[in-house]
Every structure is written in structure tokens, then in C-alpha cells.
């Protein structure tokens, strides 16, 4: 997989989204609440004690919800305006589920979409504007919208910074579980990541901590189930060089371009798989790694594919991986003296990780990444995505503060 590099902005920016339809007035069912100050994220060495998850109330949704028709199965979605979350909302609506979508009042790249655009984009879901980092606010804002049968959490920290990872990937995700259980949810689908198998980064540790919370809740209450979805790579994270190569520049990669590989999956296919987790009892209480169709591709193969689609001879720039190691060493040293540099050091480690670690399932017997052990799903291919970006550009697939080369 191509390396994830720092953008020119180290501060958090809003996640990307596709262009919204024409704005319309917010309907009466939309809930607004002023965002409270977000709690501080976890610091290294701080213990994290999860608040106990309240059991669902007596008037909760019926537990055997899988016997109900989709039109009778209400699903809560947090992270609904994110890259994957908005496709999950659309897929659930397409299948006939009533959807309660928790959103930020402003979404899209650098918050360019206001509340009206958010409501229009997620229609006909019931949109609830709330602060997922504030447990009390989230529960209060959602209280009029129960009961629900299942929940899908698509939350993710925007850049993977140390405190932001614990604030969002763990704490806000825990708040989603607490609120969902309070409204009667009997199943919880977590959008995690395949890279948590080898946790060297703060956001991976935060995600793993919450995965443990889900397992503990299922152990405490046998009527509750979960599905942990661990996708490989997203198409948009591999499309950052299409425009530059199209404009005549070489394709940039680390080492020989064979340090890592991935089986990328489209947002539509991943959303369909996540929706399957609600209705398919065979996916309950399981960790589900998932990739797209076809064989795993190295950065070298991705570059060769791109040049072939453009009808050009391949031209590559091969960057020694040691360049990143040196930068990380310097940033780590600075972070010990200047705490404000801590996130910059973490971002460097994220880039190094994605430059050298495959987004595939780890074979427990060999300790190696395995293409064969990584399940495939869907029909959308990276080649089709590249063809579309060559024709139409990256509109709706902007990378925000996470930029590939």
C-alpha cells in the first residue's frame, strides 16, 4: 500500500464527502444541540476505565430483531457524514431500514457543508446533530429517537493524533455503544481496521481497546451480539497520485514498491458488507477482515496499472524507507522536549507503517501477511476506480489532511 504522508496541515480538518444535493430546509425531526467542550483525550500512561454500559430499558426493541423485516428494524449510525458512514446510511436506506443518523452540523472537506446540506445528503434518514465526544449530550439528543434494534459505528479520528485517537476511536465510540444500548440495541457493528492486528500506533491501540469492550458486553449479556469489521484499504487512499501522474509526473513509492500490498475495497462494497452484518446471524460475535475483489496489489503494481490506463511508459521515483526513519527519529526526540510535536511524530509513524506494512490478514502460523487468508467481497475494482478518476478527477474522494505523496 502506498505510504500515508503528512499534509501541509497538522491540525485536524473535516473529513471528506461527496458533493451534496441542493440544500433544503431542515425538517422538524432534526435535532440540534450546541456542542459542549470535548473532553481531553487520553495521554500516554493514563488508565482508561470504561463506563459500564447500561442495559436496555424494558420498552426496548425486540431482541430477536433478525426475524423482522428491514422496514421494522431501526438502525443507529454514528459517523454518518464520514467517508464510509454516509455510504452505510445510503445502503441501509436502500434496504428499507429506518435510520437514525448522528452527524456533525458541518461536514465535508474543511466543514464546507452546513446543516441543511447534511440533512439533504442523508435524507430520508432521521438526522440528529450531536457531539459524540460528550456522553451526556449524545444520550439526551438520541433519547426521543428510540427504540433502535442495531447500531453501526463509523467513527474514526481524523488524523490519528495521540489524544484524538483516544477521544474518538475509543471514548466517542464507547459513547455510541452506551447510547445504543440505552435505546435497546441488540447488535453493534464496529468499523475497525485490519491494521489493528499489529498495533504499533495510538489509534490502533484505541480501536483494540474498544473491540475488547464489545466482547465484554457480549459476555455480560448473551442477548447482545456484535460484528467487528476490519477493512483493508479504501480506494481513495490509493488515488492521491492519479492526477499528478496524469499531468506527466512520475509515480512515487518507497523502496522497490514491493514492501507491502493490499486488497482495496470500494465504499459501496464495504457499506453493503456492513449492512449484511445486521441481518446475517453468521456474522455475529466475529471479527471480520474484508477486502475487495481480486489479488493483493503492491504499490509497484498500482503504479504500473495507472500508467497502463493512461497509455504511457511507467516512470517511478523510489524513495528509500530510511528517509522516513530519520524523520521519525528527529520528531520523537523533539517530542520529548516539546510536547506539541507529539502528534507530528505520530503522523510520521503512521506514514512509515503504511509504507511498509501490508493491509492483509496476518497468518498466525507464519507471522506473514497473507493474500489468500484475506477475504474478498464485492465487485468494484481499483482499476475501475482509477479509470473513473482519470475521467472525472477526485471530486468526492478528497483526502483532507491525509495525503498520499
UniProtKB/Swiss-Prot annotation:
<comment type="function">
    <text>Catalyzes the conversion of divinyl chlorophyllide to monovinyl chlorophyllide. Reduces the 8-vinyl group of the tetrapyrrole to an ethyl group using NADPH as the reductant. Can use (3,8-divinyl)-chlorophyllide a (DV-Chlidea) &gt; (3,8-divinyl)-chlorophyll a (DV-Chla) &gt; (3,8-divinyl)-protochlorophyllide a (DV-Pchlidea) &gt; (3,8-divinyl)-magnesium-protoporphyrin IX monomethyl ester (DV-MPE) &gt; (3,8-divinyl)-magnesium-protoporphyrin IX (DV-Mg-Proto) as substrates.</text>
</comment>
<dbReference type="InterPro" id="IPR016040">
    <property type="entry name" value="NAD(P)-bd_dom"/>
</dbReference>
<dbReference type="GO" id="GO:0009507">
    <property type="term" value="C:chloroplast"/>
</dbReference>
<keyword id="KW-0809">Transit peptide</keyword>
<dbReference type="GO" id="GO:0033728">
    <property type="term" value="F:3,8-divinyl protochlorophyllide a 8-vinyl-reductase (NADPH) activity"/>
</dbReference>
<keyword id="KW-0934">Plastid</keyword>
<protein>
    <recommendedName>
        <fullName>Divinyl chlorophyllide a 8-vinyl-reductase, chloroplastic</fullName>
        <ecNumber>1.3.1.75</ecNumber>
    </recommendedName>
</protein>
<comment type="pathway">
    <text>Porphyrin-containing compound metabolism; chlorophyll biosynthesis.</text>
</comment>
<keyword id="KW-0560">Oxidoreductase</keyword>
<dbReference type="Pfam" id="PF13460">
    <property type="entry name" value="NAD_binding_10"/>
</dbReference>
<dbReference type="InterPro" id="IPR044201">
    <property type="entry name" value="DVR-like"/>
</dbReference>
<dbReference type="InterPro" id="IPR036291">
    <property type="entry name" value="NAD(P)-bd_dom_sf"/>
</dbReference>
<feature type="transit peptide" description="Chloroplast">
    <location>
        <begin position="1"/>
        <end position="58"/>
    </location>
</feature>
<dbReference type="GO" id="GO:0015995">
    <property type="term" value="P:chlorophyll biosynthetic process"/>
</dbReference>
<keyword id="KW-0150">Chloroplast</keyword>
<keyword id="KW-0149">Chlorophyll biosynthesis</keyword>
<keyword id="KW-0521">NADP</keyword>
Amino acid at each position: 500500500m502506498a505510504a500515508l504522508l503528512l499534509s501541509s496541515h497538522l491540525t485536524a480538518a473535516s473529513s471528506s464527502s461527496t458533493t451534496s444535493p441542493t440544500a433544503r430546509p431542515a425538517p422538524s425531526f432534526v435535532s440540534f444541540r450546541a456542542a459542549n467542550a470535548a473532553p481531553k483525550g487520553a495521554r500516554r500512561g493514563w488508565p482508561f476505565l470504561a463506563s459500564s454500559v447500561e442495559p436496555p430499558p424494558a420498552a426496548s426493541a425486540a431482541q430477536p430483531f433478525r426475524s423482522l423485516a428491514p422496514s421494522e428494524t431501526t438502525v443507529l449510525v454514528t459517523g454518518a457524514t464520514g467517508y464510509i458512514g454516509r455510504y452505510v446510511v445510503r445502503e441501509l436506506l436502500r434496504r428499507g431500514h429506518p435510520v437514525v443518523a448522528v452527524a456533525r452540523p458541518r461536514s465535508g472537506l474543511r466543514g464546507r457543508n452546513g446543516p441543511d446540506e447534511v440533512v439533504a445528503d442523508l435524507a430520508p434518514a432521521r438526522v440528529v446533530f450531536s457531539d459524540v465526544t460528550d456522553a451526556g449530550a449524545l444520550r439526551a439528543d438520541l433519547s426521543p429517537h428510540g427504540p433502535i434494534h442495531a447500531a453501526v459505528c463509523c467513527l474514526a479520528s481524523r488524523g490519528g493524533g495521540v489524544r484524538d485517537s483516544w477521544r474518538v476511536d475509543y471514548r466517542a465510540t464507547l459513547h455510541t455503544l452506551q447510547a445504543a444500548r440505552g435505546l435497546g440495541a441488540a447488535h453493534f457493528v464496529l468499523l475497525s481496521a485490519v491494521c489493528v492486528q499489529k498495533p504499533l500506533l495510538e489509534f490502533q491501540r484505541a480501536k483494540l481497546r474498544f473491540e475488547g469492550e464489545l466482547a465484554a458486553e457480549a459476555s455480560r449479556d448473551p442477548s447482545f451480539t456484535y460484528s467487528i469489521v476490519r477493512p483493508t484499504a479504501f480506494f481513495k487512499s490509493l488515488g492521491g497520485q492519479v492526477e499528478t501522474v496524469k499531468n506527466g509526473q512520475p509515480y512515487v513509492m518507497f523502496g522497490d514498491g514491493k514492501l507491502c500490498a493490499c486488497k482495496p475495497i470500494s465504499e459501496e462494497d464495504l457499506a453493503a458488507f456492513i449492512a449484511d452484518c445486521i441481518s446475517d446471524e453468521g456474522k455475529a460475535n466475529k471479527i471480520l477482515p474484508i477486502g475487495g475483489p481480486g489479488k493483493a496489489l503492491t504499490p509497484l503494481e498500482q503504479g504500473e496499472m495507472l500508467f497502463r490506463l493512461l497509455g504511457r511508459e511507467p516512470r517511478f521515483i523510489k524513495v528509500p524507507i530510511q528517509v522516513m526513519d530519520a524523520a521519525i527519529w528527529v520528531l520523537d526526540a523533539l517530542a520529548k522536549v516539546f510536547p506539541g510535536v507529539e502528534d507530528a511524530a505520530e503522523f510520521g509513524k503512521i506514514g512509515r507503517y503504511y509504507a511498509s506494512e501490508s493491509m492483509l490478514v496476518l497468518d498466525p502460523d507464519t507471522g506473514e501477511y497473507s493474500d489468500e487468508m484475506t477475504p474478498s467481497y464485492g465487485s468494484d475494482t481499483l482499476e475501475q476506480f482509477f479509470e473513473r478518476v482519470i475521467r472525472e478527477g477526485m471530486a468526492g474522494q478528497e483526502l483532507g489532511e491525509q495525503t498520499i505523496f
